[in-house]
Amino acid sequence: HNGIIENHAALREDLDVEFASETDSEVAAHLLAREVSAGADLVSAMRAVVTRLEGAFTLVAVDAADPDRIVAARRNSPLVVGIGDGEYFLASDVAAFIEHTRDAMELGQDQVVELTRDGVVVTNFDATPADTRRFHVDWDLSAAQKQGYDWFMRKEIFEQPRAVADTLLGRTNELGEIVLDEIRISPEELRSINKIVIVACGTAFYAGLVAKYAIEHWTRVPCEVELASEFRYRDPIIDPTTLVVTISQSGETADTLMAIRHAREQHAKVVAICNTNGATIPRESDAVIYTHAGPEIGVASTKGFTTQLIACYLLGLYLAQVRGTKYADEIGGVLKELERMPEELQELLDAQENVLNLAAELKDEPSILFLGRHVGYPVALEGALKLKELAYIHAEGFAAGELKHGPIALISEGLPMFVVVPPYSRDQLRDKVISNIAEVRARGARTIVLAEANDADARAHADHFIELPRVSTLLQPLPAIVPLQLFACEVA
């Protein structure tokens, strides 16, 4: 079982059995056993059980009395069937069986699959025949292997220059205009948009926070950013003039998928930013921008974040181009800077020794804080998330301007604090952040400062200095996140 059965407590009360655990998985197992004991075959039993379950889940079952049959079902949770030579595989992602077969079948919503020696049969929960989509995986097998790295995550951190370049590839025409072939929304419809709502979870949510700054600056359209888990359970104000942008690496994030369905019920246009071709989220959206990052095996997203930023920047620039809110030379200038980004990221990765040494010094710290302002604030949040996810160290990200409204009380002697300093191009922001650094340092914090190499003021207030390349303010999250990813990975 993968996922969450939301009504498992109520179902548990209906079962007159002794439970060995508190898991929702055991509830599903007992329900299946009861149906089979009553004479149902495993397929019928599975259909009877899943119609009673609420939530997002995938179930796979085998009957000990009939071991040559595997039955699985999915609702709001991914499930793919690998089709090999005389063999079949079940997994949530093709990366699990790519070394055995590249041919696969993706199950749709509320479907049951039966695997036997004779083949694969897919039906809907109501027992009617189901439509399925077969596809061939064409990415390199090495993408699902560590290739000498100790972790998939470390490998994926070092794949970011290529992933960013691939996401940018083919996005402009011979005139230098942005071309997003996947956007199946007419220019007239895009010009009628009067509000943008970005919906995402986790790391993708932080990418959305960065996108808000860029999109509002370039398009002058109000932009909101919402957690999908909150958006779907309230009554958001959206209508046909709202553009909903969803961000999901897998394309199967349950809360984000539910948010899309809610938005479409309100007749809003939906654009998905996704890394997985043919996943549920892009299929249910009006348009999609694929990030072309390649498979992300590591649970903690790295290249997913940077390529999502690239896709968000491209969308913002495309909207500015269509709506005429930025001149062509301004858009072209940003595009040229983005095209240089793979080289900038590679230089950061080549200079990793500085970050690795810092990780060795701080690996036993019980708590680490992250501070940022403007687009540096989402970078601080993402840096803290990476450390929590990987090293299980308490970490928090704060907006620098909120320092006096509570976070300053957490500062004690020797507390490590990462600070992202804005570029010289935003002097007012930069000066305020440097003032924040001086303030926390005066209270005993150990400051790890990320700033442009030639920023002598920032360097003067740093106990440890991490050099960033010189980029425009809105694009700074791309290089700034890389040292924080490396740090979290090495500490873990």
Positions of predicted regions on the chain:
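Acidic/histidine-rich
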Residues: L53-E87, L358, K363-A391, V420-P423, ...
